[in-house]
């Protein structure tokens, strides 16, 4: 028996995450009804359903307890095992580095999922008592959530997605959900350019603009800054040694389109950094 048994459920949005939600519900429970809907909210008969799964990116301006998401449901079940990583830029690289280092240094199973094209409910059944989950979290996945991960990493905040959120304050409020529901005993690692977040977690501020002395395959001071978050989480939360974390970081490879080495001709070296879509990322 699960909490979804016998319920009438609507999946709002049928992209990758919507299809994943449908598969999860059919695999793990026995709802009385599963409907799919891809239109505007005005077309939803909310009284017909007990629960509505909203896909990321579908705009909803106010909270409603009848609405939930993959992120919300995953955190309810496994939030104590999750390292959530967000930020305007750097979250994919940091998530990759975190997964690599913890896989090398802890001896525990580590799952990488989330905003890298891996819907969390696809991995729901793989989480065990000793599992570590590295969850890349977008603003859309965090918006309207009422649960936060045990360890939160908030790298930075710049102006982005204002076509969706209208103001930086609203954009920040969506991302801040990564920490606003944290409790005593939880941890928040936050970049120095991120505004204050009200949280019960213990807070560690990582200074942006400093030079962090990590030997990485991936170039850029911003990646050494990202590596500082990984180092602090690995050593402070999981007891990894300085030597093993630095060695693991030095062996990690980068991601496509993020200062990816292309080649050299003469005295000119070429990198593909096409993922940089705002000036601060360039």
What residue ranges belong to the model's regions?
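Conserved dinucleotide-binding and phosphotransfer motif residues
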Residues: 28-29, 104-106, 236
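Residue-level detector of alpha-helix initiation sites
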Residues: 16, 89-93, 224
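Beta-strand->loop->alpha-helix junctions that form or flank phosphate-binding loops
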Residues: 37-40, 68-73, 191-192, 200-213, ...
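Active-site flanking residues adjacent to catalytic metal/cofactor-binding acidic residues
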Residues: 12, 34-38, 114, 135, ...
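Phosphate-binding loop of NTP-binding sites
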Residues: 23, 43-49, 56-187, 192, ...
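N-terminal leader/targeting and accessory segments in enzymes
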Residues: 1-69, 73, 255, 277
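Nucleotide phosphate-binding/pyrophosphate-handling subdomain across enzymes
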Residues: 24, 216-282
């Amino acid at each position: 028996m699960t909490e979804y048994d016998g319920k009438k459920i609507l999946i709002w949005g049928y992209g990758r995450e919507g299809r994943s939600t449908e598969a999860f519900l059919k695999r793990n429970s026995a709802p009385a009804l599963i409907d799919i809907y891809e239109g505007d909210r005005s077309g939803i008969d909310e009284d017909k359903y007990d629960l509505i799964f909203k896909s990321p990116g579908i705009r909803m301006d106010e909270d409603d307890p009848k609405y939930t998401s993959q992120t919300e449901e995953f955190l309810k079940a496994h939030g104590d095992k999750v390292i959530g990583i967000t930020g305007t830029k750097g979250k994919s690289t940091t998530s990759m580095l975190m997964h690599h280092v913890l896989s090398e240094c802890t001896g525990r199973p580590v799952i990488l999922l989330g905003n890298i094209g891996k819907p969390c409910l696809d991995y729901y059944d793989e989480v065990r008592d000793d599992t570590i989950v590295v969850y890349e979290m977008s603003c859309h996945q965090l918006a309207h959530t009422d649960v936060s991960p045990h360890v939160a990493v908030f790298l930075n905040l710049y102006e982005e997605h204002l076509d969706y959120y209208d103001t930086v304050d609203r954009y920040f409020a969506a991302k801040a959900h990564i920490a606003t529901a944290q409790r005593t005993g939880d941890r928040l690692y936050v970049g120095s350019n991120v505004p204050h977040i009200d949280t019960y977690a213990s807070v560690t501020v990582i200074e942006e603009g400093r030079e962090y002395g990590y030997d990485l395959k991936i170039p850029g001071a911003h990646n050494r800054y990202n590596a500082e978050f990984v180092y602090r989480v690995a050593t402070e939360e999981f007891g990894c040694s300085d030597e093993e974390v630095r060695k693991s970081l030095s062996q990690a490879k980068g991601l496509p389109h993020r200062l990816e080495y292309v080649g050299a001709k003469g005295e000119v070296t070429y990198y593909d950094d096409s993922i940089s879509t705002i000036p601060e990322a360039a």
